Structure formats: C-alpha cells, structure tokens
Amino acid sequence: MTGSGHKKPSRSPSGRSPSGRSPQARTAARLAAVQALYQMDMTGIDLTHVIAEFEAHRLGQEVEGSQYCDAEAQFFRDIVEGVVREQRRIDPLVDRHLAEGWRLNRVDSILRAILRAGAYEMLMRKDVPSRVVITEYVDLAHAFFEGEEPKVVNGILDKLGHEERPQEFARQGSGGA
C-alpha cells in the first residue's frame, strides 16, 4: 500500500455536483482538502492556519507557475474541518476495512488523507451520492498513485457506502441503468 510512490496529479477527477454547483469547483475543493489534510499530517500545522493558507494563497490562485482551479471554499472547509472533527469516528471505520495487519497510521500520508476525506463525505455528506464520493476519491487516488492504491480507495469507500447508505446501493441494484 505504500510502495508505489507518488506522482503529481496528472488529471482532474470527474466531478458531479448537486444544487447546480460547478462540478469542477467541488472536485477542486476535494483535491485541496486532501492536500490540506496531507500538509497538516506532515507538518503539524493546525486547522485554522491550513484553511487560512489555502483560502488566501491556493484556491483559485497561481502557485509556482501552476494555476489552481477555483474551488468551492465552503465545501473545502467542510471536508477539512469535518475530517478533523470526526477523525476518532472515521479512523476505526477505515481501519476495519484495511487489509489484515494494516492500520490507517501505517499507510502513505496522501492515501490516508484521501481515505479520511472520502470516509467523511460518505458518513456526513448525505447530499452527495455515494457513487459520486467513490468515483471522486478513486479518481484522486489515480491522480497521485500508479499502483494498487485506487483499488484500496474503491474497496474501502464501497464497503463504507454499503454500511452507511445501504438504501442507495439497494436502489442501484434494482433494475436501474
């Protein structure tokens, strides 16, 4: 789970957004949230400072010659704040679905951030369909990893979705497209 190394994001995850919001803005918010969670994990920067830094200097800004996409700032804040607030609930749920002998604190930091953010959305953002949560975070994993990590993200979020939102999966399996 940790041996494939990172690659720079080469593509944007495909986003879908309810309420007429730009799918790209939600996708950009998810990417920024994963980056912020990673930064907090690696540097120990606190929640208030990382959110302020991202909102002032990254979301929709040009950084080192790269243009950051406009992100839905409120959605970004909700994910980052929510992961921090719900981490004691999220981590054991993710741990339960990792391969035997693995714990969340042993996986790669970016993968850990992706899993936490995806689990938060699956648990707390019922306005976002589970299939969208899974697709978005699998696409994010593909942007950072070339190995098995996207499959890990897919498997864990799918299991969480079946546990937390069984009605969505029951509807999907009953004669739909």
Predicted regions and their residues:
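N-terminal interaction/assembly modules
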Residues: 1-177
